[in-house]
Amino acid sequence: MKMTSKKMKDELMKKLSRPEWDCHYDSEKEVLRIEQTDSKKGINVSLPGVVAKWEVNKEKAIEEVAYYVQEALIAMHKEENSMAKILPVIRSTSFPKQSEEGNPFIMTDHTAETRIYYALDSNKTYRLIDERLLQKLELTEEQVREMALFNARSLGYEFKQETVAGNTFYFLNTNDGYDASRILNESLLHSMREKISGDMVVAVPHQDVLIIADIVNEIGYDIIAQMTMKFFAEGHVPITSLSFVYEDGDFEPIFILAKNRKKTDGKEKG
């Protein structure tokens, strides 16, 4: 039997037939492209080269090429899955802005006390994304931010509730490494705002806790201040000992509000 590029194309398509892969044949260039149906990422196989190998090794040449294509496409799929695990992490503004190797991290300003970093999660651990890793991922900073916020919205949440002196405190502590990151879920914040009757105070003292409080009196402010300081001191990855009043999508550090209150009180007394 004489092997031709067209016959080789048919042989390879038989071995590479999967519902998640598409095959396209360019008869002019004698190239077979096998790509993922969803992402369109794939491999181009020059058929004359495979035919030449077949003349020497026969069926073994076809098996080797098919194996190479399969492994490459599977690796691409795994890489895409890992990219789907890009998540935001909250850190203090004093946290380093670059890796130990000197590569700047991808960051976004958040509040006066916090900054958003981005992590490539591999289930067991994660690595903060710096400019070097960004190039390897072949993503833009904007794409990383969009993917991270999208994935943050998919994180589940279940609060424990405690009421002290009329003030209600909601605690989120799943220990998945992203408890503080839930502060970026705007729909979560809006839903909590609707159920809160007093001031909505939010705190992320360390990586593994998110506190949302319904503060109705001054005692509540004292409690949240002490609570946040305690969690901050005990946290494995501390973020900030300050808490924030959340209103209309903005976070206002409570110490600033306290200063403003003192100024107002002083003017009234005068």
UniProtKB/Swiss-Prot annotation:
This is UPF0354 protein BcerKBAB4_4524. Disulfide bonds: none annotated. HAMAP family: UPF0354. InterPro entries: DUF1444. Belongs to the UPF0354 family. Pfam families: DUF1444.
